[in-house]
Amino acid sequence: MAYDRLLERLYLVDNDWIVKGATALLARDLAVRATIDVDVYRQASSREIAEAELREAAGRDIGDWFTFEIGERRTLSEAADGFRLPVKAFIGTAAWAAFHVDLGGDELHVTGEPEAVPALARVVMPDVEQHGYLVYPLVDHVADKVAAMFELYGVDGAPSTRYKDLVDVVAITIAASLPAELQITAIQSEATHRGLRLPERFTVPDLQLWGRGYAREAGRSLLPIARTLDEALAVVSPCLDPLLDGTARGNWDPEQRRWVKSSLTE
């Protein structure tokens, strides 16, 4: 509820904001992990301008009894090109929720088009409107997560431990359709952007490490299947392998769990 009320205010200031991260998956009914962050960005806008708009939005009274306090920003530890701002939400004088807003500017690399989705929580109040959000393209969401799992981190080039990304890819694979051509383009573009050479078959950088880490992350999630790494790889490989080797055609069918050519492309 608090996320939605802050986002509603933000869209009243500017309607070009894009919701990313776990909140975007939640808005698509694809989320299986809890989050205390709202990840947003606006193209063609510096982070400083974006922060000013966020603070302006938080101060608006739109008749829903919510008020917000925005704390001091800090640089994101995993990505120095973003800000994190703590937020406290109140109803009247009572504290309601505390979360963070991760704020990006115009550096984001996007292949697809942002998509409109309904509001997270429906509010039934006289004269209170909900307009929904624009969310990060799903093909770019997948591309980001795939690339992040292959990227090396730190000065020593440590392998990725982003187990949560594999949890999210499993959730997307079993519930969402993906267009092959655009998804291939998004993955290749993201790999180029990060300076990565991706393999033609999906795997994780360290089977033993990821076996333990993924099982912990999946155990905390709402995934209905794939609680072990082997099970997760069995679920995502039919989707990701044809994307990585460029042979995927048509659309990913989450029910059949295979790439299906349309009648126009057969």
PLM regions and their residue ranges:
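Structured mid-to-C-terminal alpha-helical surface segments
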Residues: 1-17, 26-38, 42-266
